[in-house]
Each structure stands twice: as C-alpha cells, then as structure tokens.
Amino acid sequence: MKQTITALVGLLLASVMLSSCDDKRSFADMLSDENKSVNLYLSDHRVVGSIPPDSAFEVGPDAPYYQLDEDGNIYMQVLSKGDMKLRPVKDDRVYFRFLRYNLNRYQTGEDLVGVGNSNDIVGSNGLGTTYFLYDNYKLQTSYKYGTGLQMPMHFLGANAHVMLIVKSQSGWPDEMANVIPFLYDVTYYSSPLSPWKAEVDADNK
C-alpha cells in the first residue's frame, strides 16, 4: 500500500512542478510558505511527533496534534475516537462530513472560513454523498480526496471526530498545484446500508 501511495504522489508532484514553471513564484517558494503556515498553526498547539502505542491518543479540544506520517504532511487532533469496535476494512465505504480551512490565511492573520459538506444530508442513507473506499488508492472516486483524509481511519472507529492538518502533497490531487495546507474538521461514519463489521473482544469470543 505504501509503495502505491508513494508512486502516485511522485507522479502528481512531477506534473505539479512542471505546471508551476511558468508561475511568478516557484514551486519551492510555495512549499516554503505552506510549511510556514502549518508550523505557525502548530506552534499554538501541543505536537507529538509519533503515533502512540496501541492508538492510545489523548482526546479532547486540548489534545495534541499527532504527526501521522514520516514526512510531516498529516497531523491529527482527536476529539472523539468513535466506536473502536466498529472499524473499516479494505474497500469498506467510509462516509465523512467536513469543514476545511485554508491555513495560509492563518499566517496572514485573516479569518478562517470553513468550506465543506457538513450540512450534506442528500442520499437515502442520510449521510450525504461524500465517501471513499477505505485503503483503496486505485479508484479515482476514492483517491480524489487524497491520502490524508484516510489516515485517521487506520487508528479510529465509526463516528470518530478529528481535526486534521493535511498539506497539499497528501491532499486532493486536483488541488495539489495550488500548494495550500488545509485544516479539516471531519467526522467519519459507517454506512447503515452496508455497515462495517464489529470486532469481537477476545475475552468475549
């Protein structure tokens, strides 16, 4: 899985760098600004540079931001772990509602305005139409949201609620050339039409 993600990101970055050659600001300059924006935001919060053993994340609005990847492109603050006995497996539908905020505005002191689908209730399942297939990075309908939004589901359960920082390299591929880091307020759901299978405790088997 990691090799597939790395290859896809590499191809996307190559195309982004080529498309940025004619811009007044270089791709490197834009990446530098992105890092400054993220670092400024994180400087106002606690940061843990690794994933805790057994996913023992601190929870709540004062919890730290945990670095989820080796490159420092994804950071997560856990507001709710959700149902840890109800977790997705490969190709399960994961519905999500979110608001996202442009963190470059944080650096310039502008108001952060959230944009997203948090009020989307279209669809027979009542969860809206926005979903990805868990751990599937091949189908465009799933990969179009990037790798960052899937990361919390490696560690959390249904109805998990997190604040998630996603740099452009792990964000939506069609927006990668913009080099904008986003802060997501996102909640994940299992579909009632095809629910994830609950895990059984070893002591209760």
Residue ranges of predicted features:
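Cross-family detector of peptidyl-prolyl cis-trans isomerase
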Residues: 5, 21-205
